[in-house]
Amino acid sequence: MRFLLQSITLVAAARAASIDLESLFGPYVSPETEIAEVGDADFDEVVSPRWSEWRPPTWTGAIKPQTEEDLQEIVRIAVANNVSFMATSGGHGTSLIYGTVKGLDINLANFNNVDIDLESNTVTVGAGAKLGDITEPLYKAGKAIQTARGNSPCVGVIGATIGGGIGYETGLFGLGVDALVSVRIITATGELITANETCNSDLLWAIRGAGANFGIITAATFKMFDQPNNGDAVIGTFVYNSSKSLGVFEYLSVLDNVLPPELGVQLSIGYDRTINETLLTVDIKHFAPWATFVDHWEHAEALGPISRNVSNVTLVELYAGLDGPCQTGAYVSGGTVGLGRTDAATMQEVFDDMTAFYEQYPGYLGQSLFQRYANNNTLKTPAHTAVYPWRDTKMFWLHENIFLNPELEAPTNELLVSLREKLHATSGFPADQPHIYVNYAFGDEGPEAWWSKENLPKLSYLKRKWDPKGVFGKGTPIPRF
């Protein structure tokens, strides 16, 4: 391994207004590492793909390291030469702040290993592994983990988890960060270290909810669980027209205190332009035998759906079908707020506001999602084990603005903020304490909303310790002072 001083000495002359990336990095990384400037014929093959066209970073080049040693050298050289960079995997992160980022893309796609250890009951995944990469190996092993499963198969495992890690199996297994037992992480000095309960435990605390701010995680190890229901699930999709909206919202409020752990529910508000009507879709994922699903089916049927589809599937089939966010080319921004209670009247206001917006802007394709997972197991984990603060959230609202014309950005941003304020006002949480799940953040909420006022002093201290120059975590930055 080459040492930092050697790298600095040899590349110091490369500092200039225009940096030749091949000259800067090429001599110090393995031959398999790919380097491309913007405009090179192979740039699109080296840079990480992005899901959304909204506020993307401006890349000055891209590099795809082959080994951890390559990645260490890249970080050392970039920091020494004031080359801004951002490590990427699935390319699904969005934030208002990303549009201000200019720098080098470090594509982690080559770190896509998935290693199951039945003896220790853990699985280790590389930085480039996608959720689709882990589903079948876990299924064949009869195991499961809660690492934000419920996201699409093209989403990066680690990125989707280190902000909290919610998904359809949250009721059964709790948060993804609570199953995170160890990481290998490259810090701002280029050092590769381990963080677990016995080594750098404070850093592990910070990674469990704010991991993107402290380095590049090359591998993460998670505790596994026995697969629920022998790897099978019952899934039901029920679609309702606008006349049923309030009844559907009232049904959702019934689940506030009686949601069983094996049940995951997502309600979405969207618009069907073939019939020019706002529709509600209730997706139910039931990780238990068919017989125990019947009550939920009967409730959904009693609300009068215009269509329904119910089937038995394997977990592999279930998660392979969640491929919506794998489609690229549109402008997509996201925003969120956590809810401690379901207020049907407020949800009806959201429905009405979105209907008016759909009718005013024919090019708008967005949707609002309300995600319900039992939080009993989430609450069982002591709060002091992770910086993730919002364990009392009962329902996660995720609003996705989707449009093809960039001129719609301003009105869609206003819609998102307006809906967020309405929902927070009746969320059951204090007015000055919005519960923002950082993985869904719009980008304007601020660190107190992402990690809580109580956690910020310790979190800022650790940021100063591990990343004093703020080279990591550009999308949701931690204040250092």
Swiss-Prot record:
Transmembrane segments: none annotated. Its EC number is 1.-.-.-. GO terms for molecular function: FAD binding; oxidoreductase activity. Asperfuranone provides anti-proliferative activity in human non-small cell lung cancer cells. Residues 1-16 form the signal peptide. InterPro entries: BBE, FAD-bd_PCMH, FAD-bd_PCMH-like_sf, FAD-bd_PCMH_sub2, FAD-linked_Oxidoreductase, Oxid_FAD_bind_N. Its cofactor is FAD. GO terms for biological process: asperfuranone biosynthetic process. Keywords: FAD, Flavoprotein, Glycoprotein, Oxidoreductase, Signal. Residues 52-227 form the FAD-binding PCMH-type domain. Pfam families: BBE, FAD_binding_4. It is an enzyme of class 1 (oxidoreductase). The keyword Glycoprotein applies. Disruption phenotype: Completely abolishes the production of asperfuranone. It comes from the Eukaryota. The modification Pros-8alpha-FAD histidine is found at residue 92. Induction: Expression is regulated by the asperfuranone cluster transcription factor afoA. Glycans are attached at residues 82, 196, 241, 276, 309, 312, 376. GO terms for cellular component: extracellular region. FAD-linked oxidoreductase; part of the gene cluster that mediates the biosynthesis of asperfuranone, a probable antitumor agent. The polyketide synthase afoG is responsible for producing the 3,5-dimethyloctadienone moiety from acetyl-CoA, three malonyl-CoA, and two S-adenosyl methionines (SAM). The 3,5-dimethyloctadienone moiety is then loaded onto the SAT domain of afoE and extended with four malonyl-CoA and one SAM, which leads to the formation of 2,4-dihydroxy-6-(5,7-dimethyl-2-oxo-trans-3-trans-5-nonadienyl)-3-methylbenzaldehyde (compound 2) after reductive release and aldol condensation. Belongs to the oxygen-dependent FAD-linked oxidoreductase family. This is FAD-linked oxidoreductase afoF. It comes from Emericella nidulans (strain FGSC A4 / ATCC 38163 / CBS 112.46 / NRRL 194 / M139) (Aspergillus nidulans). The lineage of its organism: Eukaryota, Fungi, Dikarya, Ascomycota, Pezizomycotina.
